[in-house]
Amino acid sequence: MASFDFVKAYQWNYRPQIPKRPAWFTEWPGGNRIAVTFTIMHEWESKPGWATMRRFPMPPNSYHTDDFLGLGAREYGANFGIWRLLDVVDKHGVKATVISSGLTAELFPDTVREARERGHEVASHHWNQTLQPPSYNTKEEEREAILKSIAAIEKATGERPLGYMSPGPRPSPFTLELCAELGFIWNGDYSDSDIPYTINVNGTKVVSVGYVRPAYTDNDIMELGLSGGLQQLKDEFDAHYEEAQRHPMKFRYSMHNFTGGRPGLAKVFDNFIDYVKGHSGVWFCRCVDMANFWLEHEGR
């Protein structure tokens, strides 16, 4: 069985014990060879936030710490970028996973509500991007933030999210336990495997559906320019597709509403979907679809 024990693998001295490919895993649903998942990061952060730290710190003698350029980017993502990305996947008839901060769902409930109405999955991305789980002192502090995110998404969409990804993604030693306790069936934090796998968290199974960086997010390709970024995505997909002829593979591309949602990178995404659709044996799926497929074979 392609699962492993949470206590052994996820401890302070993290040493992965990722299982080998299970014998039953010979194909994806429909006999497909490669699963392709698109995730849209629908993020928000409170001041001063990561936006400040990513560019440069505010002057130490500044009378305020508001990074209006960085915070404005988040406004752009929620008001324009998310809609552009949803329109791209809808154009191609592909369903995506929107990974939303709870605060985004609270401030812009129409975005996650309509995403769900269009058939896309809405997963939790913690409460906001400013506070990473490792910054919490206790498991209960992290639990409270995740519960706030769940409540905001459920209020906006009418459904409780089934997937979770930490900001960063930088989970804490408590994160997987909280995912299991709070009813999440998948987690997207770990970039340690080419395929999904189940994690046995104190008797509850959580499916890991992470991705391996670099080159799998808009942040990884944006410095290459639009044509260079598209070529990088094609090259990465080609490598996965070639290997998928020997054994099933997964490919996940992730976009942020405030970067990948800009016209240029959104067009790169549009063209990339066209390219992928030109290949046979491709299963376009949401993260929850992949997790459910895995649990159907591994047991819940």
What spans do the regions from the language model cover?
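Catalytic alpha-helical scaffold of carbohydrate-active enzymes acting on polysaccharides/glycoconjugates
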Residues: A2-G163, G168-V207, L230-Y253, G260-R300
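Positively charged, amphipathic and often flexible ligand-engagement surfaces
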Residues: V209-G228, Q232
